[in-house]
């Protein structure tokens, strides 16, 4: 039996892929599938344009500028600065390896929408994915110059874009009372209409194909010969393989295997506007406001902010309040929100995911650290883990995602 630990979008997709191949699977999480962590509250954007890792020489200046901006989108509590500095040092180092890291990340991201589309069709839920692209808008002075620069950057990466339609731009400009506007359309991107339903669909399909879905708070993994003991607060389950997919909580489970993992919890926030009519039927990224708005079933969801407050800090109420003010300024009906959410994204300093095997314990595998694009990469990751379990060579190669890169 294979224990998949963590029932977020990565773990549930992995369990689904393994079960569809006829393997005995145990999907374990302390919460119901998709109801905790970043999988519940993400923007729903299938971000196949994000071929480059975030760290870059130019981003180093932008990172600190955003950090010090009044009500800016990036926040690190003062008390966490000492603990955060080692991660930040590695982030800065990775900035000068961006080109090499793009070579590893881009082949994994580029086919991600097709892979997710195929997987959702295989489980009978193609309705969850909408392939209408997404829009990127600039509303401040210099909007046309910045849109043109972004189009050139995307062309170098072979990411297709087109100018946003004039009627859409006029609608967004009037809603925000802006004097200038420019925008791009990314036709190859997509979005899901309900991220939680995607996770539930993966978990339900796994269960329909024989997987057991159980609620346990896994505390540790112990090797016993060729078996793995999954130790929870209530019992111990013996399995042949374990796959760690616990997102921002993964480092602690892997520590006993000699892996010191520089994993941070970059918390994101969302608010929802129930019953709101979208400006268009596809997601919009407002670049100047660092705000994403996605049409979902029965509501609009808006996401923003990156808060390195750690796993245990309470949510910062200033962030949803600021997001609400931003949405009102952009012309959205954000006076009566459906509530706010905060969840931790698992982020490694080079912004590459961690996918592979524990070197000295090959029946312990891991798949986490997908930063902002876990939903995007869920199907690709599931396929890759299924290949690793079956001793098939994954395509594309994920050798660069091995955790030994941090040794």
How would you describe each model-predicted region?
Residues 20-40:
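Glycine-rich FAD pyrophosphate-binding loop
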Residues 85-204:
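Rossmann-like flavin
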Residues 42-45, 50, 54-92, 220-227, ...:
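Active-site substrate-recognition segment that forms the wall
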Residues 166-173, 191, 214-228:
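A conserved short coil-to-beta-strand element within the FAD-binding core of flavoproteins
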Residues 137, 141-142, 165-173, 265-266, ...:
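Flavin (FAD/FMN) cofactor-binding core of flavoprotein oxidoreductases
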